[in-house]
């Protein structure tokens, strides 16, 4: 997958204020407020910035944390990660591998088979429902 690079000014023009704050500035939406927190529609969640596929609904589960949670991405190559020491703690930030959009964080307290919990902002995602036929 080719890397997609745009300036912050271009992203600011392309995205809503909320998406820009979360995806490009590393913000976080309020818990239990996101569009996809409680949805159970079958499909694939894509990056809201570049449309890269990130998570399948088959890997989504209710972690009770207030954000959509997944136990694995569609492919390991879909995401990148880096250490995040903000807010006086250490976490692992998760980003879209194609455009470096901030998605959320990954924690080692998820269910089998991976034991991981990808805690993702709804604003960084777009759900493409599976076709009925």
From Swiss-Prot:
GO biological process terms held by the UniProt record: protein repair; response to oxidative stress
UniProt cofactor(s): Zn(2+)
PROSITE patterns: MSRB (PS51790)
A GO molecular-function annotation: peptide-methionine (R)-S-oxide reductase activity
GO terms for cellular component: cytoplasm
HAMAP family documented for this protein: MsrB
Name of the protein: Peptide methionine sulfoxide reductase MsrB
Classification of source organism: Bacteria, Pseudomonadati, Pseudomonadota, Gammaproteobacteria, Pseudomonadales
Gene: msrB
